[in-house]
Each structure stands twice: as C-alpha cells, then as structure tokens.
C-alpha cells in the first residue's frame, strides 16, 4: 500500500515535469496524450489505494508518518481521481477548440496540460499529507498551480481574475497557517513525543488535553484561512471571477474538487476542536458561516448574467451547505456533509463542462445572448437539464439524498427557524437555476444560427458524469456509504451506531448497514 500511495503522488508530478521540459513547439497531441495518461494513471491508482481503504475501513501510511490514508481521505482521493480523469478527457477537444478559435495560442497547450497535472498533484498532496504544516503548504500550492490556469487566456478580465485569486487566497490561507501553528504549539506541549506534534494521526488522541482558549482561536483562524480556499462567505470574493475566467475543465476541477479538498482540512481540525472544547463552539461558527454563504450566494445568483458566474455562486451556496452540515453536527450531519462533497463535486463538474459546450456553440457566456440551446445543440441541452436538475437537488439525483439528510439532521438537532431560513435560501438558488433552463435552454435560438453540437469526445465524459449523478441517487454504491460511515466516525472519534439508528438514514440506505453488506 505504501508503494501505491507514493506512486499516486508521484505520477501527476512526474508527468507535469516531463511536459514542462518539452519544447514549446512539441505537437499538441503529445501534451494532450501525456496529460491523459497522467490522469488515467491517477484514476487507476486512486481506485486501487483509496478503494481498498473504503472497502476495508483500514488505514495506510507511507514514508513513516508523512502520508496517511484513511476512509475520510480516501473519499476525497477518489473524487480527485474520477473528476481529474473526466475533466482531463474533456480538456482534449476543449483546448483544441480554443486553439482553433484563436482564444488560446497553440504554444500555450504546454502550459495548460503541465499545470493541469500539477494541480491534480497538489490536491492529492493536501488530502494524503499527515503533517499539518505540509497540508497547509499543499493547499497554498494549489493556488500557485492554478493561478496561471485561471489567467491562461491572458485577456484583461482573465488576468484580473487570476491576480485577485492569488492575492485573496494567499492572504486568506495565511490565517490558516497561523491557526495550524497554534495547534502545533498546543500539541507540542501535550503529546509525549514533541517531534510528532505536527502529525495529525499522532496529535488526535491527545486533542482533549489541548488548551481550550487556544483551540477556539486556532479554529477561528482555520475556518477563515481554509474557508477562503473553500469559497465560504465572506472570503468567497475570488471564486466567481476565477471560475468564470478559467477554461471550463479548470472551473470544473476548482469547484468539483479544490473547494472540497479545503473542506477536508477544515473537517480534520473540526475533529480536533470538538475533542478540545466540545461541539458547541465549532458548530456555532460553522452554522453562521454556512447559513450566510447559502443566503448571500443564492441572492447573488440572480444578478449574474454570466453563465459560469451563476454556477460559481451556486458553488458558494453548496459549500455553505457542507459547512451547515458540520455546524448541525452529530453523525447524521457529518455523513450528510461528506455525501454532499461527493454528489456536488460530480454534479458541478457536469455543469461547468456543459457550460463549456454552450460557450463554444454561442461564442459567449452571457445568458441574455444564450437562447435555444435545445435547437442549437440538443445533446448539450439534455445534459444541461440533467445538470440543472441535479444542482436543484431534485430526485432521483444524488444531491437530493445529501440535502434531504441535511434537513433531517437540521430538524432533529437544530432550531426550526434556521431550517426554514436555509430552505428559503435553497429555494431562491433553485429559482436562479430554473431561469437558465427556461430562458436559455428552452428559448428560441437567434435567427440564422445553425446546429453547433459539441464533438463526441466532449460529450462522452459529460454523459458519464450524468449517469453517475443519477446512479448516486438511485442506488448509492455501498462502498461509498460504508466509507462515509467510517469517515464520520473518524471526524467525531466515536461509533456511528447513532447513524444506523436514525430512521431516515435507514430509509435511504436500507435497514442493513453498508458495512455488513460490503462484508
């Protein structure tokens, strides 16, 4: 298993370096092929390593204490593997179309594909690192690897977006470093072997001995710092600009995986904080941040004429849902948060990829100018409707399950007024998505505009994504359910019997536990 983990980390890094040292005049097909091999290898290795951990519930380490893979990390490693591969496949025709249209010079393909693999590497590093300082560095490195992808078109708005992304995230994540160092200093005073104070798996058993005052301060900095990277309000200001200006496959990776990787770090420290100060403080903080993220994002969606900016604010709203689940707490809240990370990751990846089809067909992202997608690109229109229904959390899509469990957890544990407020916010967000369907997808195409369907190689990964988000809702894979249950126990440091005893949870996933079915 150690070899698998190291190979998983090394593969995208090595391919990125190989592409970086190739001459600029190397054929586009060489760069595209190398990147596809890179993300395909990452997918296979992630299934072999993380899939085994999810099925068994065991943990694995590499390089001593430096890298650690448990069920919590395995969920996100698989998310990176699948979405990285599908967006990598989608990138082949997408970037080629950009080059043919003149929006990207041919020699810039080298930069795109080298940074794409590097981006995958930095996210894997953030999820697999067991050293809290290295984890922070990996999250910071995701900024460095993506800032040039955001600005790759090098027009004024793209460069402004990349500059804003770099400044806001670098400044925000610095708060995360301060919180991390406070936890490290706290741990060094408590654990028997001070040289192990930076390693998460070594520190967690002693978290209940940490200084409560320092931990409250540290967790506040953690939420501000890594919440900036996750796109939580009020640190979300970089996200709409970066998502709208980046190439659509990069937007899909940013929203589908990067935001979730930052939330994983918050979940790790959330578990520490609960052990040190109890659940009330971290839950209250995340309830406030999550609720405000949902409300602000939902209201902001209506004001966006740019299709990708509207989807970007939808990402802020859904990260808010994840934070809200953590704020509600308890086994059901944590399980709902983890499921929402997975289901939203795949659904939003589909949405951003489809937005790329639409942008290439109409030559614009302006919703005022995008009308009659169903007439211009019927297959794209069908996929767009599936993505919008999925984002609206309608049955039988996966996000229906995670949001349903969120409301069950909220009604069970939280104040009823909060549940009502959040429900109103989500309704507003659904209305903003419905306007895309009614006016853009089903409207009448501009006069004289002919058919402009996306090529098959762009449609194939989108069809796979559409099938997956339906599969998650109709028959959620038992290994995923089992992994979520085990990961919930890791976050809370307690048994998940309470989760199995919840009637609504049993109604969704069956009366038998996922673990017993897997075994």
What are these regions (language model features)?
Residues 140:
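Short phosphate-coordinating micro-motif centered on Lys-Gly-acidic
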Residues 1-5, 28-34, 63-73, 105-113, ...:
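Membrane-interface helix-boundary signature
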Residues 1-7, 14-114, 489-490, 512:
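Transmembrane helix-loop-helix hairpins at membrane boundaries of multipass inner-membrane proteins
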Residues 27-39, 160-172, 377-381, 456-464:
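Alpha-helical transmembrane segments and their helix-start/interface "positive-inside/aromatic belt" motifs
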Residues 110-113, 253-260, 458-462:
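Select subsegments of transmembrane alpha-helices in polytopic membrane proteins
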């Amino acid at each position: 298993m150690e070899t698998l983990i190291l190979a998983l980390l090394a593969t995208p890094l090595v391919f990125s370096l190989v592409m970086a040292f190739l001459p600029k005049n190397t054929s586009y097909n060489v760069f595209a092929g190398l990147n596809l091999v890179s993300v395909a290898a990452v997918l296979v290795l992630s299934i072999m390593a993380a899939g085994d951990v999810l099925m068994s519930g065991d943990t694995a380490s590499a390089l001593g204490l430096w890298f650690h893979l448990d069920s919590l990390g395995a969920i996100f490693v698989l998310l990176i593997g699948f979405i990285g591969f599908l967006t990598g496949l989608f990138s082949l025709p997408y970037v080629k179309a950009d080059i043919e249209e003149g929006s990207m010079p041919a020699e810039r393909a080298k930069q795109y594909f080298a940074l794409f693999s590097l981006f995958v590497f930095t996210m894997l590093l953030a999820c697999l690192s067991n050293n809290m300082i290295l984890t922070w560095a990996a999250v910071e490195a995701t900024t460095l690897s993506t800032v040039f992808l955001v600005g790759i078109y090098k027009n004024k708005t793209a460069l402004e977006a990349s500059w804003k992304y770099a400044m806001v995230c670098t400044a925000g994540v610095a708060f995360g470093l301060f919180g991390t160092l406070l936890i490290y200093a706290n741990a060094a005073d408590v654990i028997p072997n001070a040289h192990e104070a930076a390693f998460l798996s070594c520190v967690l058993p002693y978290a209940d001995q940490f200084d409560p005052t320092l931990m409250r301060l540290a967790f506040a900095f953690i939420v501000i710092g890594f919440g900036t990277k996750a796109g939580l309000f009020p640190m979300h200001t970089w996200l709409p600009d970066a998502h709208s200006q980046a190439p659509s496959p990069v937007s899909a990776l940013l929203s589908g995986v990067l935001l979730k990787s930052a939330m994983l770090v918050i979940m790790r420290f959330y578990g520490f904080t609960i052990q040190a100060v109890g659940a009330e403080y971290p839950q209250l903080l995340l309830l406030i941040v999550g609720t405000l993220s949902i409300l602000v994002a939902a209201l902001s969606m209506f004001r966006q004429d740019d299709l990708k900016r509207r989807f970007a604010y939808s990402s802020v709203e859904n990260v808010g849902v994840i934070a809200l689940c953590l704020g509600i707490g308890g086994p059901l809240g944590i399980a709902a948060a983890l499921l929402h990370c997975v289901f939203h990751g795949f659904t939003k990846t589909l949405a951003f990829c489809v937005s790329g089809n639409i942008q290439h067909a109409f030559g614009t992202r302006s919703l005022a100018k995008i009308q009659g997608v169903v007439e211009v690109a019927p297959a794209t229109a069908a996929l767009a409707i599936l993505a919008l229904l999925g984002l609206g959390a309608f049955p039988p899509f996966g996000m229906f399950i995670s949001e349903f469990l969120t409301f069950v957890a909220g009604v069970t544990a939280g104040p009823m007024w909060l549940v009502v407020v959040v429900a109103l916010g989500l309704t507003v967000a659904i209305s903003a998505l419905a306007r895309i369907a009614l006016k853009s997808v089903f409207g009448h195409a501009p006069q004289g505009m002919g058919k402009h369907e996306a090529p098959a190689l762009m449609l194939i990964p989108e069809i796979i994504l559409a099938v997956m988000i339906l599969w998650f809702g109709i028959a959620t894979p038992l290994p995923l359910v089992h992994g979520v249950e085990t990961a919930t126990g890791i976050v809370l440091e307690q048994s998940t019997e309470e989760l199995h005893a919840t009637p609504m949870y049993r109604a969704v996933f069956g009366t038998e536990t996922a673990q017993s079915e897997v075994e």
